[in-house]
């Protein structure tokens, strides 16, 4: 067993070396586009750009974190944030009895007709989004009886730092977390979605919001995405999703993933230095006090 684990880790290490080289080349080609990311006019453009900056930075502790086992070179360029791709989602029409939804689907979901399906299916089936990379392996993992694969894809998305969570291009307040048949941070960490976890984020959200109502000072310190909506087919980890809706009051905000703070800029500075210069008049001490407060 130990030899098998070592062989798996060696394979992961080889993948990490290969992917690191590809991502380094992507950084050399595209980094200048991100040098003025804080000047982008829309909050979502700033967020997705900072996510992309963070994607070029290796994990601080896990030596082979760069490996996305299950992504070949083509898939990496099509679906990883380092390459800033844009793609459409695939869709399944599942029998209503086979799919559990935590709430009504978002209004911007595509129609059955748009997906090339008969409109009459709307009464008997419900749509479930699928990542294009997972789409290719669906039969291998199984589908509920009566499931129909939509002939057309729909909804343009861009990958965030987490890779399996994507931002809806035309509705950037909406992010969708999707299962991916890819392993990261170890051969056993397959990036699927356990159905029971669909409800964890919403529970945490409502708990924090309840605390905020009791403590106004606490409530002024954070905003929380709405994670009420999600769906899953029975206990199938490859047939699930979580929809996250960002608050509407983000128009002038700049959201900064912590993972992006130490990202290098083309001019040699760290991103946190640019951030401090823009919002704290260059005072790292003031920024640090705010960050730790």
Label for each model-derived stretch:
Residues 1-129:
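Noncatalytic N-terminal accessory/assembly modules of large enzymes
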Residues 89, 96-291:
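Conserved ATP-binding subdomain of kinase catalytic cores across diverse folds
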């Amino acid at each position: 067993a130990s030899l098998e684990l070592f062989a798996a880790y060696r394979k992961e290490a080889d993948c990490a070396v290969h992917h690191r080289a590809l991502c380094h080349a992507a950084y050399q080609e595209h980094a200048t586009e991100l040098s003025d990311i804080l000047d982008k006019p829309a909050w979502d453009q700033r967020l997705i750009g900072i996510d992309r900056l963070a994607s070029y930075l290796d994990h601080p502790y896990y030596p082979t974190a760069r490996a996305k086992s299950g992504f070949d070179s083509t898939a990496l360029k099509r679906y990883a944030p380092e390459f800033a791709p844009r793609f459409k989602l695939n869709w399944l029409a599942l029998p209503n009895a086979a799919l559990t939804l935590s709430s009504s689907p978002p209004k911007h979901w595509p129609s059955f007709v748009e997906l090339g399906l008969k409109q009459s299916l709307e009464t008997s089936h419900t749509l479930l989004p699928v990542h294009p990379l997972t789409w290719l392996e669906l039969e291998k993992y199984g589908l509920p009886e009566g499931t129909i694969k939509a002939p057309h894809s729909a909804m343009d998305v861009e990958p965030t730092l987490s890779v399996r969570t994507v931002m809806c291009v035309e509705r950037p307040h909406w992010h969708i977390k999707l299962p991916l048949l890819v392993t990261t941070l170890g051969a056993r960490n397959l990036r699927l979605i356990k159905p029971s976890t669909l409800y964890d984020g919403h529970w945490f959200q409502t708990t924090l919001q309840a605390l905020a109502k009791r403590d106004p000072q606490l409530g002024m310190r954070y905003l929380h995405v709405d994670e009420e909506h999600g769906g899953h087919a029975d206990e199938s980890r490859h047939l699930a999703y979580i929809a996250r809706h960002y608050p509407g009051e983000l128009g002038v905000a700049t959201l900064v993933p912590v993972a992006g703070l130490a990202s290098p800029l083309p001019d040699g500075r760290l991103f946190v230095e640019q951030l401090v210069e823009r919002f704290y008049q260059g005072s790292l001490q003031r920024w640090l006090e705010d960050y730790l407060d």
